[in-house]
Each structure stands twice: as structure tokens, then as C-alpha cells.
UniProtKB/Swiss-Prot annotation:
Its EC number(s): 2.7.4.9
Designated name of the protein: Thymidylate kinase
Pfam families reported for this sequence: Thymidylate_kin
Database matches in Gene3D superfamilies: P-loop containing nucleotide triphosphate hydrolases
Family: Belongs to the thymidylate kinase family.
GO biological process, one term: dTTP biosynthetic process
Keywords: ATP-binding, Kinase, Nucleotide biosynthesis, Nucleotide-binding, Transferase
GO CC aspect terms: cytosol
Keyword ATP-binding attributed: yes
Organism of origin: Herpetosiphon aurantiacus (strain ATCC 23779 / DSM 785 / 114-95)
InterPro entries: P-loop_NTPase, Thymidylate_kin-like_dom, Thymidylate_kinase
Domain of life, per lineage: Bacteria
Residues reported to bind ATP: G9, P10, E11, G12, S13, G14, K15, S16
Described function: Phosphorylation of dTMP to form dTDP in both de novo and salvage pathways of dTTP synthesis.
Length: 236
């Protein structure tokens, strides 16, 4: 047996951090586990990530954005996720197809039926076994992201640039991308879309308050994953 767990949530909810903590815990416990992310996770998907999230592409059409995310996802599923699941491992993914429904569907108003068809084509119908939703009020999450952005800029200014290496532009800041910069109303629609999806499929989704202390949230996630590990063989 294998296990496919995805992390979803508003911007700044701590998905990436908690996914790393869970990966480290499972690895130390002897489970075969990998952590990947969307968009990204392969050289091709990472190239798409740089394109689709770059702040300079303000004129990108919603349909173009949707198809780029789907292309990155197709590569990640085919190259990384499916092969590891077939080996009986645990795959943790920081965002997956639900992000498309939330952002391009509810956020940008793309047709949800069409998005489901695109997603089915890109993933071969692969669904997560479990999705952890880290919930946080939109403004609180964006405040966290702004702080991360500002800290990044400050540290970049303090560091001495190496003349033989290309220096990142502000648009390449992983802590603040083209989607982060959208208006509050967009992010509110995204969060509302997530909540609708959770209500429609409560067996797959587990909701956590991302506003609590980081250590407490980690403990809750570790407890939540335990019942799903009974069929996974450890490496030892």
C-alpha cells in the first residue's frame, strides 16, 4: 500500500513548513517518504513554476495560467508521484489539483467542470488519499507573506553579491509571487472555494487552525497521520 497526502490552504498558512516537519518525522520513523511541491518538483515543472509565478507577467491570461499549472502537474505526477506510490511509499505534496480549483476556479472564475476535465487529463485521475487544509484568515496570511518578502529583501541587500553569479530579481522572490500580489477579494474567493470543497468531500479533508503555535500545529498533524500509516511498511 501507498499513501498520498497533500497540503492546501491560503497564502501564508505555513503549508511548506508543516509539510517539511511531517516529512522529517516520517523519515526518522523509518517510513519511505518524499516531499514535493506544486508547481515544481521536477526540472521541467520548476521551469514552469518560474514562468507562471513571475511577477513580470501581469498580462498572463487566466486560461494560460491554468494550462501552465496543469502542465507542471502532469510532469510531476508522471515523473515523481506515481512512480513513488507504485513502490509503496508515502508522497507529501505542498499543493496539488485543489489549488487549481481554488485559485483558477473560484479565484479567477474559470469553469469548474472544464477544470476537472483538464485536471483529469493532466493527472490520469490521481486523487490524494488525504488532504490537510491549514486554515487562516486571508489578511493574517498575507501579512505573514509580506513579512517573509520584506525579510528576504533585507537579507538580499545585506549579502555581498558575487559578481560571477546572476542576482535574483524581485520578481523571483519565492516569498512573494504574482498570485500573492492579487487583491484581497481574490484571496477571499480562494479561501471560500476551499471551504466549499471541504464541505463537499469531508472524508478526504482534515482542517487545522494555522493561527495556533507552530509546534502545536505540528503535533496535531502528526496525530492526524498516525491512523493512515498502518498499511505502510517501514524501511527497517
Amino acid at each position: 500500500m501507498s499513501l498520498f497526502i497533500t497540503f492546501e490552504g491560503p497564502e501564508g498558512s505555513g503549508k511548506s513548513t508543516q509539510a517539511r516537519y511531517l516529512k522529517d518525522y516520517l523519515q526518522q520513523a523509518g517510513y519511505p517518504v518524499i516531499l514535493t511541491r506544486e508547481p515544481g518538483g521536477t526540472p521541467i515543472s520548476d521551469a514552469v513554476r518560474r514562468l507562471v509565478l513571475d511577477g513580470q507577467w501581469t498580462a498572463m491570461e487566466p486560461t494560460t495560467e491554468t494550462l501552465l499549472f496543469a502542465a507542471a502537474r502532469a510532469q510531476l505526477v508522471g515523473e515523481v508521484i506515481l512512480p513513488y506510490l507504485k513502490l509503496g511509499g508515502i508522497v507529501l505534496c505542498d499543493r496539488y489539483a485543489d489549488s487549481t480549483f481554488a485559485h483558477q476556479g473560484y479565484g479567477l472564475g474559470r469553469n469548474l467542470t472544464e477544470l476537472r476535465e483538464i485536471t483529469r487529463f493532466a493527472t490520469g485521475g490521481l486523487q490524494p488519499d488525504l488532504t490537510f487544509f491549514l486554515d487562516l484568515p486571508v489578511e493574517q496570511g498575507l501579512q505573514r507573506k509580506r513579512k517573509q518578502r520584506d525579510d528576504f529583501r533585507e537579507s538580499s541587500q545585506l549579502a555581498l553579491p558575487l559578481p560571477h553569479l546572476p542576482q535574483p530579481s524581485p520578481s523571483q522572490n519565492e516569498h512573494w509571487n504574482r498570485l500573492d500580489a492579487r487583491e484581497i477579494a481574490y484571496h477571499e474567493r480562494v479561501r471560500s472555494g476551499y471551504l466549499e470543497m471541504i464541505a463537499a468531500d469531508p472524508q478526504r479533508w482534515q482542517v487545522f487552525d494555522a493561527g495556533i503555535e507552530r509546534e502545536s500545529l505540528t503535533e496535531q498533524l502528526l496525530l492526524a497521520v498516525q491512523p493512515h500509516l498502518t498499511t505502510i511498511k517501514t524501511l527497517s
